[in-house]
Amino acid sequence: MLFERATVFTVITLAVVILILDLPWLFISSKWAGDMIRDIQGSALVLNPIPAIVVYLALGFLATIPTTPVESFGLGAATYAVYDFTNLAILKKYQPLFALADTFWGGVLFTLVFYVRSFFSI
């Protein structure tokens, strides 16, 4: 069942939807995250586009799984929590408040994607 919903077209479409919906958070949090990354690695954050594309495709695949808004929020929060709390566990200067905010955003983002997916029958 899962792979029937996760066609290549669906995954790519949802990856684009996620990127578009993620842009406001990326913009809003850019100074906060940028300053934190600079503190951690000693240089400015530089986007490497190929891994970024892989991440959004993986998120697009994950977004095919939930069947309710609550499941969507849970999966999004869990997905972002894995990233954020792994960073918090291993990076000395990763900020707990950022980890919480980004984890919450993951839940909100996946819930928004669920509604877009439902509205457009993606």
Residue ranges and their predicted role:
Residues L2-I122:
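Juxtamembrane/disordered regions of integral membrane proteins
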